[in-house]
Design a protein with these regions (language model features):
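Substrate/ligand-engaging "lid" and interaction regions
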Residues: 1-486
Length: 486
C-alpha cells in the first residue's frame, strides 16, 4: 500500500505527538513574498509567521525560488506543508503551514512579478545568500552578468535585486504603495546594502523610480540566527517513520532561534513581537556580534576542521585543541572588536554559542559551512582583522582560519574537487599553482581583490597571514594540530 503524501487533508491522520497548525491553512491569504525559498527561510522566518497566522491570517507567504524548481516541485503537491524537526535533547516534529504558494521564477516569471505587484503584499523578505546581492564591495556590481541582463531587460529580471526593482516599478505605475524589503541574510548592515543596490539598479533605467523608492520604500536591517543543517536521507526516513506520511522535503534546525529587526516598515507589518521577534531602532550591534562571534567561529571550525578530516561542527568541538582555539579566538581576539551594548554580556553569548556548537543532535556538516568562502570571510573575519589592526590589537590567531581557507582551496584544487564558491574557478586556478611555500602562495592569493583588497597592502596582515599559512603547511592534520597549539 503506497504511503500517503503530507497534505492539508492528511493533517488529521498525523500522530498527536506532532505539532500541526493551529489555524486552517486554506483560510490564509498572502501578504508576504519571500525570495530564496531555501531551508533557512523555511526553518526560520516561515516558522515565526506560522506562529502568527492563527491571530492574523493575512500574512501567509508566497515562497519564490529564483532558479531551481526543486522546492516548488517538492512542496506544491503537499499544499505547501512541510515538517520542521527541532533537534535537542527533546526532539520535536512540527508541521509548518505558513507557505500558501510556491513559485519558481525561472519558469513562472509572470506569476512572480504579478505577486510582487499585488496590493495585498506589503512585505518582501529575502534569503538569497551573500552572493545573491551581486555586490562589488558595498555597491551593486553593474558588470555582474545577472545585473547587466536586468539593466538591458528590466521587465524580465534574473537577480533578486532585479525582481525587487521590477515589482516596485509596477507598483509605482499602478499607484500602489511600495512594499518593505527585508533582507534576512548574514550581511553586516544588510538593509542598507539592499537599499543601495535596489536604488542603483533602478537609476540605470528610471531615475523617477529610483527617487520614489528612496523616498517611500523602506529596507530594515535584520539579524537572524538558528543553525540549520542540510536535509539528508536520515531525516527524511525519520520523519516518514514518525508521521506515517511522505514528506518530500522536511527540514531540521536547532531549537534556538533569534530574529532581530529594525522597526522601519513602510506598509504595515505582522505583529512580529508576539512571535518572539525583537524589534529595535538600531540592530547594528546585534548583527555585528552575531557575525563575528557565531559566523566567524563557524568558518574557523569549517576550514580547520576540514583539514583535520572532521565531518561536523560537533565533531570539531570534540577536538580539544580546536575547541580551545575557537573559544580563545572568540574571547580574546573577536570580543575586543565589538562595541559595548546595554544588556549584552559577551561571555554569556560566547558560552551559549559554544553549547550550541556542541549539540550532538545537530549534524551540521563542515563541508556545507565551507561553501562560498570568498563571500563569507570578508564579512565574518576580514573586517574583524581590519578593526583589530586599526586598534593596534594582535591578529595572529584571527589569521589562522583565513590561512586554513587557503589551504582548503589548495587541497580541493590538488584533488581535482570542485570549489563551491562564486570565485571558484579563479581560486582553484590559484590553488593549482601553489607550492605550499607561504612566500610564493600568499602573494598569489592576495591578488583576489574581491576578497583581500582592503588588507592586501597592509604589511602587518601579509606577515601574519604568511606566518599562519606556513604553520599549517602542507595542510596535514599533524601540522594543523601543531599550529593550534602555538
Amino acid at each position: 500500500m503506497p504511503i500517503p503524501t503530507l497534505s492539508i487533508a492528511a493533517l488529521a491522520q498525523l500522530p498527536t505527538t506532532v505539532l500541526t497548525p493551529s489555524y486552517t491553512p486554506k483560510h490564509t491569504t498572502i501578504g508576504i513574498v519571500h525570495l530564496g525559498a531555501g531551508a533557512f527561510h523555511r526553518a526560520h522566518q516561515a516558522v515565526y509567521i506560522d506562529d502568527l497566522l492563527a491571530e492574523d491570517p493575512t500574512w501567509a507567504i508566497c515562497a519564490v525560488s529564483l532558479h531551481s524548481p526543486r522546492v516548488r516541485d517538492a512542496l506544491r503537491p503537499q499544499d505547501g506543508l512541510y515538517t520542521l524537526a527541532l533537534l535537542d535533547e527533546h526532539p520535536q516534529l512540527r508541521i509548518i503551514g505558513a507557505i500558501r504558494e510556491l513559485l519558481c521564477a525561472a519558469d513562472e516569471q509572470p506569476a512572480v512579478l504579478a505577486r510582487l505587484a499585488d496590493p495585498a503584499v506589503c512585505l518582501v523578505t529575502l534569503t538569497v545568500t551573500e552572493k545573491g546581492y551581486c555586490l562589488a564591495g558595498d555597491a551593486l556590481d553593474l558588470a555582474h552578468p545577472d545585473i547587466a541582463h536586468d539593466i538591458a531587460h528590466p521587465a524580465a529580471p534574473r537577480s533578486a535585486i532585479g525582481y525587487l526593482v521590477a515589482g516596485l516599478q509596477q507598483r509605482m505605475r499602478n499607484g500602489i504603495a511600495p512594499f518593505t524589503a527585508l533582507s534576512c541574510d548574514n550581511l553586516a548592515d544588510n538593509g542598507t546594502l539592499l537599499q543601495r543596490a535596489v536604488v542603483r539598479l533602478a537609476e540605470q533605467n528610471d531615475r523617477a523610480l529610483a527617487q520614489w523608492i528612496a523616498q517611500h520604500a523602506t529596507f530594515p536591517r535584520s539579524m537572524v540566527d538558528s543553525i540549520t543543517p542540510a536535509t539528508d536521507d536520515a531525516l527524511r526516513a525519520h520523519v516518514q517513520d514518525q508521521l506515517g506520511v511522505h514528506d518530500a522535503w522536511p527540514i531540521q534546525r536547532e531549537r534556538y532561534s533569534q530574529w532581530v529587526i529594525e522597526d522601519r516598515f513602510c506598509n504595515g507589518r505582522p505583529a512580529f513581537e508576539r512571535a518572539g521577534v525583537t524589534l529595535s531602532e538600531d540592530i547594528a550591534g546585534y548583527a555585528r556580534a552575531k557575525l563575528r562571534l557565531l559566523n566567524a567561529p563557524h568558518s574557523a571550525l569549517a576550514y580547520l576542521g576540514s583539514l583535520l578530516n572532521l565531518e561536523t561542527v560537533a565533531d570539531a568541538m570534540g577536538h580539544p585543541e580546536l575547541a580551545a582555539f575557537v573559544e580563545t579566538l572568540m574571547r580574546d581576539d573577536i570580543t575586543p572588536t565589538l562595541q559595548p551594548m546595554p544588556g549584552f554580556d559577551p561571555q554569556q553569548y560566547i558560552d551559549a554559542i559554544l553549547a550550541r556548537f556542541r549539540n550532538p543532535a545537530i549534524r551540521h556538516l563542515l563541508a556545507q559551512i565551507a561553501w562560498d568562502g570568498s563571500q563569507k570571510l570578508s564579512v565574518r573575519l576580514l573586517g574583524t582583522i581590519g578593526d583589530a589592526l586599526a586598534a593596534g590589537q594582535p591578529i595572529q590567531r584571527l589569521c589562522l582560519p583565513v590561512a586554513a581557507w587557503l589551504h582548503f582551496i589548495r587541497r580541493q584544487a590538488g584533488n581535482g574537487a570542485a570549489l563551491v564558491d562564486p570565485l571558484g574557478e579563479e581560486l582553484s586556478d590559484i590553488g593549482c599553482s601553489t607550492t605550499g611555500d607561504a612566500g610564493h602562495d600568499i602573494p598569489a592569493f592576495l591578488t583576489v581583490d574581491a576578497v583581500f583588497s582592503s588588507l592586501s597592502a597592509d604589511a602587518r596582515f601579509v606577515q601574519a597571514l604568511e606566518h599562519s599559512y606556513a604553520a599549517l603547511s602542507p595542510g596535514s592534520p599533524a601540522h594543523v594540530q601543531s599550529a593550534l597549539s602555538e
